Design a protein with these regions (language model features):
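Leucine-rich repeat
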Residues: 2-3, 28
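Secondary-structure "cap/kink" motif recognition
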Residues: 4-13
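PLD/PLD-like phosphodiesterase catalytic module centered on the HKD motif
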Residues: 13-16, 20-176
Length: 176
């Protein structure tokens, strides 16, 4: 995760697909900054076996949209792809863009620095984008009733803090 964070800090183009998207605030800040200086497109899940993860992702949309990030939700079926393309570098593997994947689970992401491969993977990204609904600022505002915003905020707290803390303690003990 630190390599991806460094690349996002200095990069100008990010295409990201992740079913679970609830990164820490520091990563959200980096993505928002990149949205102001370059092009950022993120595809998250519209469907999941865990609705809290969708709500947690939606909690991040307003800030990212305000900073020029393009947000999409993949609609045809459950999303399982984990893909990050920063400029000419591709990261592909098992890690979602959430606390559990970034800090708890044993995940593998293959880093490939190759312009031609990055373009091939952007072709794949474009095909997934065609099956995704763009979440515009207007659409997000229409969806964001006070009740939904509350659910999104609580879900973000649940998946970034409660789930992380409980899982960490169960896995590593109280001192872990």
């Amino acid at each position: 995760p630190m390599q991806i964070a460094r690349e996002i800090l200095t990069g100008t183009r990010l295409d990201l697909i992740s079913a679970y998207f609830s990164p820490p605030f520091a990563m959200l800040r980096r993505i928002a900054r990149m949205g102001r200086r370059g092009r950022v497109r993120i595809i998250t899940a519209a469907r999941s076996d865990n609705n809290a993860t969708i709500a947690a992702a939606r909690h991040t949309y307003a800030r990212l949209l305000r900073n020029g990030v393009e947000m999409y939700e993949y609609r045809p079926q459950k999303l399982h792809t984990k893909l990050v393309i920063v400029d000419d570098v591709v990261h592909i593997g098992s890690s979602n863009f959430d606390f559990r994947s970034l800090y708890l689970n044993l995940e593998v992401m293959l880093r490939i620095e190759d312009r031609a491969f990055a373009e091939q993977m952007r072709g794949y990204f474009e095909r997934e984008l065609a099956d995704s609904l763009q979440i515009t600022p207007d659409l997000h505002r229409q969806r964001a009733s006070w009740w939904r915003r509350l659910k999104w905020t609580l879900s973000y707290f649940l998946v970034t803090t409660v789930d992380y803390t409980v899982t960490r303690r169960l896995s590593f003990g109280p001192e872990g």
